[in-house]
Each structure stands twice: as C-alpha cells, then as structure tokens.
C-alpha cells in the first residue's frame, strides 16, 4: 500500500509540472499566433525479462516529451522537446513559430472547434499503480516462463518470460482555454517458448494485459497457454490450392476489422484513396452486425476522455445493422470534407463487435470442413481496391473437428466481399485489443498451397 501511495503522490506532482509546462507554452505562443495546441506526456515504469529463470534484463524508464503546434494566418508549425525547462519550452515554441512562417497556407488548418472540446474530462478509472518490486517482477516473469517449460518434454527451448508495468500522465491544452489531463497504467506478463518434434521446431507465445494487476491472468495460466499454443503447431502440413470456408480466430479477426479503420479514416476519404469512398450510408457488413465504439469504458485498454486534439470522445455506432454510419474524422479531415470532427485524432477507442452467441466449437461444427487461421503474415492488403492476400498458418478442420496444423499457405479475397459475406461472429471475444470481437466465419476464400 505504501508503494502505491508513493506512486500516486509522484504522479500528482508530475501532473502539476506538466500542466505548468503546457500553460507556459500556450502563454508564450498566445501573442504570436492565431491559435496553438500543446500536448505533453510522461511515462515511467519497469520492464523485466528472464530466460531459463535467470534475469536477462531489468530496465527502468522515465520518458517525457512536449509537442506544440501553432497556427498563424492558416500556416502550421510544429516542434517538440524532451526538455521541459522554461528555457527549452521557449525555444520549442519559437521553433514552431519559425516553421509556420515557411509552410503553405491551408484554410483547413487550425485548432479543433471549441464546442467539441472536452473541457470537463471524465475519470475513466485508468490509473491502477502496481505494488511490484523489481524482485517480484522478476519472479512473475520467471514463473510464467517456467510454467511453459515444464508443461511438456517437447518444449526444448525458451525465448523467455517478460513483465512490464508502466504509469503515465498526459496533459493537453489549447488556445481555446482547454487544459485537461489524465493518468493511466498498463501492466502485462508474457512468455515465449520453442517446441521440437521429429526435427520440426515451432514457437509461440501467450500474454495477459490490463490496467490493474488484478486484471492479469496468473503466471501459471500464461505459461500453460503458451505451451498449449506452441505444442499445437508441431508437425504442420501444407495444403493444396483450393477454395474453402475460413474461420479467423479471434486474435486475428481483430485485424480483419482493423482494415476497416484505415478504409473509413477521413484522410483516406478526402484523398479518395479508399475502396469504401462511396459507402457512407450503405451496407458494407451483414444486416445483423453492428460495430459500437465505447471510448469511456471503465479500465478499457483503448479508453480516453478526449482525442489527441482535445476533442471529447463519445459512444458511437460506427456500423449499424451492417450500414456504415460515419467516417472517422480529425479536425483537419473533417474540414476538408465539410463535416465535424468525430474525436478520432490518434485512433479508435474500444470497438465492440457483438457475436451471435456461437462458441468457437459450435463455429467449427457449422463450418464442417475448412481452415482456421491463427496467424497472418505480410502486408498484402490494398487500401485502394480492398484486395486481400496474406501469408497464413492455422489448422485444417474436417467434420467440425481440428485435424492438424497447417503452414506456408496464402489466403486471398477482397475485403468488400469478405465483410459483406460474414456468416457469423463467435462469442469468444478477444478483449486485449482496441477492437474487441470473437472469431469470424467466412463462407469461402482462395487458399494457395503447394
């Protein structure tokens, strides 16, 4: 308890220092620009790694930075500094002002609209400092690694266990009078091992992450899951080239919807560089599927009271009954499109994709015969056409049951068709991502094998 109270007092002191830094920068810029915005952050924590129970690395870090953007006569200049002394802040502000003199005027440039700002940011319960000493952190990492190593004699090597615990302070202010900040924590534990059988070697990992230590799985759970995942990959086979149904396991299904983020981002829309350019208000997913955004989810890993421009975040339906309801807009992209910012400067905030109640095992039965994808490789996705082609590994399924692991295959399709034809989304929700969804069943994809 004493350690946690010490961290809390340190963070409160840091926050006051950061607020003073932001106020100083804004004051220096106020008479020399039409508008300004300042963001400053400080992250402190410990990272520990072990291998065969021995300490590999113990790293303490305390990193901070201030960034300022000024706007003058529709010209924009930005500068940053890791030194928060008054003299350094003054130099940084002047550097931003100097840069603005040489940039081209842009009528869409400027501070976020005042009526959209989060002048009263809510507390989202993101701050849970850990009472973990370096010795305890080392023990947690070693236990996770050891649990994996002891699970099976086929596990012959290890890449180690790791534990991370960090707390951070973010403060944002602008020339509209906004000055808000919040504190947050993030803790994680992981392990990675190598298994060997008949000359074949495979590796995999497992991890747990949360805002509070109490949200983490035990080291023994991490090790056991790591061992299970690694052993399941042994003796993979290759597939013949074919077309077949595909299940994206939950941890890769999040990426399937991650491509939607880029496709509906305001920057892609005003540049006309997205295959969903004419899709606003149209159906792009099955009519039973809705994507909700919950930026104020308590303790959420992607929760935030405001975006990186100070715009307040709000609960939204991104997709409603399969229909795309809005673009993801920053202040700049919104002005380019004649719209208002949606609070998405810096990314998305806790997307939730509701499943249809089927377990993963029930989805296997529904698919019958086909491919389960558990790993994806490469970046073969076109933002212009939606064409999708990526290296994959996973498991072959027959009669609703997993038969054997597969590797060295490529799956291909087009995202428009893939999204529109989703058969079902499972109830095995992956909660460790900014996109929370279960496994996804597609009726057919091209599979390129041997």
Curated annotation (Swiss-Prot):
Note, other: In strains containing the pMccB17 plasmid, required for the maturation and secretion of the antibiotic bacteriocin microcin B17 (MccB17).
GO cellular component, one term: cytosol
E.C. numbers: 3.4.-.-
Localization annotation: Cytoplasm
Protein name according to UniProt: Metalloprotease PmbA
Provenance organism: Escherichia coli (strain K12)
Domain of life per record: Bacteria
GO biological process: protein processing
Similarity field: Belongs to the peptidase U62 family.
Cross-referenced InterPro entries: Metalloprtase-TldD/E_C, Metalloprtase-TldD/E_cen_dom, Metalloprtase-TldD/E_N, PmbA, TldD/PmbA_N, TldD/PmbA_sf
